[in-house]
C-alpha cells in the first residue's frame, strides 16, 4: 500500500506546510508521495521529488458559499474533496500544517480501517457517547470508499449548504458517523484530544504562535537536502 500524505493551506502558511512535511520525511522513511494543496501553480521554494504541489484554488468551494468565510480559511475544507482532487490515490493520511511528526509512524499508513472510511483521534471534550467526534487535524482516509460510497460528495454537499461551526470537521463527523475508526491518540496529540507521553504526531491545535516553538522553528529553517541527514 502506498504511503501518501497530504497537507493543504493558503499562502500565509506555506512555510508551516513545508516544516510539517519535513518533520514527516525526517522521521518516516517509507513515504511514497507528499501532496501540497495550495493556491498557486508553483511553491515559493524548490521541493524534493517526493513532494508534488497542486493548485486547488476554487476547485472545491466557491467564494460566497455558506462556509467560505470561517474562523480558519476556506482551504480547511480541501480535505472534504480529496476523493476528487486525488482521483488516482486509494488512501491518504491528511495532516494539518500545524502538526509535527515526533517519531516514526510509518505503521499508521497501513492501519486496518476495518471497513470504515476514515480513522481519526477522538475529541473527548466535544462529544458524548455514543456519538464519536474526531479531530480532523490528522485523518487516515480511504478515498476509494469515499468515492464509491458517495460519502465524499456528501461531506462536500453539507459543507456547502449548511452553516457549521467547524465546517470541515463537523461535515466529516456528521457524514462519517458510524464509519469512523478511532485511532490511538499518539497520532494526534493535542490539548483538544489527549497528550500521551509517547506521542508520535503532535498537533499545535489552537496554539497561538506555534511557529515560535523550538521544534517547529528547527524544521522551518531546515533545508530540504538536509531532511534525512539532520538531527533534531
State what each model feature region is:
Residues 1-9, 18-19, 36, 141-232:
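A glycosyltransferase accessory/donor-loop signature
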Residues 23-31:
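Short, acidic, metal-binding catalytic loop of nucleotide-sugar glycosyltransferases
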Residues 33-39, 120:
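Short internal beta-strands
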Residues 43-84:
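Active-site-proximal specificity loops/subdomain of glycosyltransferases
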Amino acid at each position: 500500500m502506498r504511503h501518501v500524505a497530504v497537507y493543504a493551506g493558503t499562502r500565509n502558511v506555506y512555510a508551516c506546510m513545508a516544516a510539517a512535511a519535513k518533520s514527516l520525511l525526517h522521521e518516516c522513511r517509507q513515504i511514497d508521495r507528499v501532496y501540497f494543496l495550495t493556491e498557486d501553480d508553483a511553491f515559493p521554494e524548490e521541493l524534493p521529488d517526493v513532494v508534488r504541489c497542486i493548485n486547488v484554488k476554487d476547485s472545491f468551494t466557491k467564494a460566497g458559499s455558506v462556509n467560505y468565510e470561517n474562523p480558519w480559511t476556506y482551504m480547511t475544507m480541501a480535505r472534504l474533496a480529496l476523493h476528487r482532487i486525488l482521483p488516482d490515490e486509494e488512501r491518504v493520511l491528511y495532516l494539518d500544517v500545524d502538526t509535527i511528526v515526533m517519531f516514526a509512524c510509518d505503521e499508521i499508513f497501513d492501519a486496518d480501517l476495518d471497513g470504515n472510511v476514515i480513522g481519526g483521534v477522538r475529541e473527548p471534550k466535544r462529544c458524548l457517547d455514543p456519538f464519536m467526534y474526531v479531530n480532523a487535524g490528522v485523518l487516515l482516509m480511504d478515498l476509494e470508499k469515499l468515492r464509491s460510497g458517495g460519502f465524499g460528495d456528501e461531506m462536500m454537499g453539507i459543507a456547502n449548504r449548511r452553516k457549521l461551526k467547524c465546517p470541515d470537521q463537523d461535515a466529516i463527523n456528521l457524514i462519517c458517523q458510524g464509519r469512523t475508526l478511532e485511532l490511538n491518540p499518539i497520532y494526534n496529540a493535542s490539548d483538544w484530544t489527549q497528550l500521551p507521553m509517547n506521542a508520535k504526531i503532535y498537533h499545535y491545535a489552537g496554539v497561538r504562535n506555534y511557529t515560535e516553538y523550538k521544534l517547529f522553528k528547527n524544521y522551518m529553517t531546515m533545508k530540504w537536502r538536509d531532511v534525512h541527514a539532520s538531527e533534531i
